[in-house]
Amino acid sequence: MASITGQLSPMYINNVNTRSAYQPYIPVLERFDPRDLEVPKGVFVPLSGAMYFPTVHGMSLPQRRPLGLVQTGGLMSEPMTVDVVPGKLYTVLNTGCDTLRVGDHFMVQFPQPEDTDAQLRASKKPGTRRICNAASFNRMLPLWGGFMAVKKIDPIVPRELMHQLTRDVVTARSSELLYGLAGVYDLVEKTSAAARGVFKDIAEKKAVTKEEVVAAMTADQVDIFRKIVDEFSTMLNCVNFATIGMYHSSTLANPTPSLSQNQVWCNTDGVTEPGLQFHAFIKQFSGV
């Protein structure tokens, strides 16, 4: 499957309306109506199952969350096509503070103050407004400043991360992930056994007192739950959730020259400034 059909997350709507968990530098989304707001093509969006979050408005700093890439754009009130398969060429919107050129590698991250500032400045430029028709851009305008940021990284970083991913997940018998899963399975079995008697009585419609339920969930069982959380933490720490790509070419026939005196001959010359789109080869989505 090359893409998923994403629906706008109800949690996103609730967070924006209550204005909770805002980072102070993320501009407040004053009005929110999915029928009046549009997501641009080329932005990375956090996912939760088949739900997506178009921006980080109303979100606290996420530690690990799967990402998808919007390739169609459109109104939030309608289903959105979100791509999640690596190893392909995609159109990406430069939502970071860096200018990008051929050969640059990038990682998708929660926007920092400089990224938010770059997005807001880019939204006022005529070149950015030409990425779509005027009506669509006006519907996108309130979202600028809250998109996930495309951040330039050293080319060696993807190689190191891919090596870690192969070592920790793909390689059998030496993976902390596999050992962690085994540990979680064992702890869940112990927890289930501790309360099995109570579950049996409930299934047989026998009277179950509060004392019996409390006895089934003693401090030992609470400690088992703590260990389960620790096991999951160990697994997550050994899995790389980064989304990484490489700049391929500009979507413009004549992109901005890297120096004012330089001549641009084709779409692989020059640079892509914040607010403009480019073609990128996505090496991995959320560590996959």
Curated annotation (Swiss-Prot):
Protein name, per record: Uncharacterized protein ORF27
Naturally occurring in which organism (per UniProt): Ictalurid herpesvirus 1 (strain Auburn) (IcHV-1)
Species lineage: Viruses, Duplodnaviria, Heunggongvirae, Peploviricota, Herviviricetes
UniProt gene name: ORF27
